Amino acid sequence: MSGDTCLTAVCPASGAKPKTYSFKGGCLGNKYIRLNVGGCLYYTTVQVLTRHDTMLKAMFSGRMEVLTDKEGWILIDRCGKHFGSILNYLRDDTIALPKSRHEIKELMAEAKYYLIQGLVDKCQTALQDTNDTYEAVCNIPIITSPKEEEKLIESSAKPVVKLLYNRSNNKYSYTSNSDDHLLKNIELFDKLSLRFNGRVLFIKDVIGDEICCWSFYGQGRKLAEVCCTSIVYATEKKQTKVEFPEARIYEETLNVLLYETPRVPDNSLLEATSRIRSQASHSEDDDGFELRDRVRRIHVKRYSTYDDRQLGHQSAYRD
C-alpha cells in the first residue's frame, strides 16, 4: 500500500449488526484508518480527512466523537455512494463530477452534510451550467445510409418529410434556371422545418441517387413522392432540368399532418390522402387493399423532344 491515500470501496458481508463503541478521534494513532460509510468500506489517512476545515476534520481531530464497531471500522451513518468522490476532492481539490444532474445533486447533498464548501460550489456551478445549456429546437438529421433512413422513419412517431438533393448525380449540364430552382427547394425545406419542427420530422438525404426529390411518410409508410428533375433536349443536346413545384410540395406537407395520430390503420384517412380514382363498382375490401399498397408519386417533367409529346407535358403516375 503506497501513497498518501489508499481508497477502496467494498460491500461488507451480511451478518449480525455490529456493536459500536465510542471513543475520541484524537486517540487515533495509525496513519491509515478504516471507514464504514453506509455499508461501503473505505481506507484512507487522517491527513486527508483533516486537510480541509470540514466536519470530517472535526471528527478526526478529537473535536467530535466518532463510533467504531468491534472490528475497528469507524461508522458514519451516511450513504457511501459518493464518499469516494469526496475523498478524492479532499486529497487534491479536484473531482470528476457525474454527468447526471440527479447524481450531482446527490453529491452536493453529501458535501453540504460534511461542510465541504468548495465541493458544494463546484456542484452548484455544474448544475447552473446544465441549466444554461441551450438545446436546439429544430434538429434535422442527415442520412448517412439507407439503413439509418429506414430506422429513423420506422421509429418516428411523427410524420416524416425527406428532401433528397445531390447535385453531383447529374450526367449532363443543367438548364439555366436549374441551380436557382434547386436552391429554392432547399430554402423551402428549411422554411417548412422551422414552421412544423414540432409536428413533423424533417430529414435530409445527400447520398441518394436522385438530384432533387421530396418524399412524404406517415405512420411508417411512404405516402407520396415529388421528383423535381427531368431530362430535356436543347439544340440536340441533353440537359438536366430542376423544377420547383412549390404548390405541390405545400400540399403534400399538409397531407402528412393528417398522420400525427397514433399508428392505427384508418382507411378513410388513407383514402382522403391517396387520391386513388377507384371505380364505383369496386368493393370496399378492394379499395382498402389498393389504398394501403399504393404510393402516390408525382414526377414533374417538361419535354421538348422530337416525338409526339407536347411541350409542357406533366405526368403523374403511381406505383
Curated annotation (Swiss-Prot):
Q: In which pathway does it act?
A: Protein modification; protein ubiquitination
Cite the entry's keywords alphabetically: Cytoplasm, Endosome, Nucleus, Ubl conjugation pathway
Q: Name one GO biological process term.
A: stress fiber assembly
The keyword Ligase belongs to this UniProt entry's keyword annotation: no
Could you name the domain of life of the organism this protein comes from?
Eukaryota
Q: Where in the cell is it found?
A: Cytoplasm; Nucleus; Endosome
What Pfam families does the entry give? Answer: BTB_2
GO CC annotation, single: cytoplasm
User: Which GO terms of the molecular function aspect are on file?
Assistant: small GTPase binding; ubiquitin-protein transferase activity
- Domain annotation BTB: ranges: 31-99
Tell me, in one coarse class, where this protein mainly resides.
cytoplasm
Per the database entry, which stretches of residues form a coiled coil? Answer: none
Listed under subunit, the entry gives: Component of the BCR(TNFAIP1) E3 ubiquitin ligase complex, at least composed of cul3, tnfaip1/bacurd2 and rbx1.
- What's its job? Substrate-specific adapter of a BCR (BTB-CUL3-RBX1) E3 ubiquitin-protein ligase complex involved in regulation of cytoskeleton structure. The BCR(TNFAIP1) E3 ubiquitin ligase complex mediates the ubiquitination of target proteins, leading to their degradation by the proteasome.
Q: Which family does it belong to?
A: Belongs to the BACURD family.
Protein name, UniProt field: BTB/POZ domain-containing adapter for CUL3-mediated RhoA degradation protein 2
The upper taxonomy is:
Eukaryota, Metazoa, Chordata, Craniata, Vertebrata
Record gene name? tnfaip1
